[in-house]
Amino acid sequence: MRCGMHSIQTAGKEIAKVMKNPLHYQLSEYDCGPTSMLNGISYLFEREEIPPKVIRNIMLYCLDCYSTEGVPGKCGTSTAAMMFLSNWLCGFGKIGQLEVSSEYLSGESVYLGQESRINDALKRGGVAVVRLYYDVEHYVLLTGIEDGKLLLFNNKTKLTPEKTIEYFI
């Protein structure tokens, strides 16, 4: 799986493998990026812990791509926007606003395996937002590894059997 990705995890504490809030599906054909990021935050934190600034900035920084007709947002979220958002979240965590850290990975850094940063984040209770290629680029949320299988939440729709992704580690 070669794609852009970044992981989000709480800084310095072990997380119970229990989702903190329900995950959401996309509201449109274009908002898989912000929906995946918001789901990552929702998965890791209780509602009361999530500052409004995080929600606002995720929506503000995403949906930055223009369609071929010049309509803003109708081509989703760029990798540059996700990188910027990842860096912003990391900085937000460093100043103590939310116990979160984030790292943007690209190119050869993005792989699944025993020594990968993705697996490390998932094993430590974090999540990863990953850009996959179905028919088009699409962001999804990885929430863990269970019985050697990667746990993936596709916020677009429920996966049909032919689209189910299982990765055995």
Model-assigned labels for residue ranges:
Residues R2-N21, C62-I169:
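Conserved active-site-adjacent core of cysteine acyl-enzyme catalytic domains
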Residues C32:
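Active-site-proximal loop/helix segment associated with metal-binding centers of metalloenzymes
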Residues S36-L44:
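Buried hydrophobic packing segments
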Residues F45-N57:
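Short, well-structured active-site flanking segments
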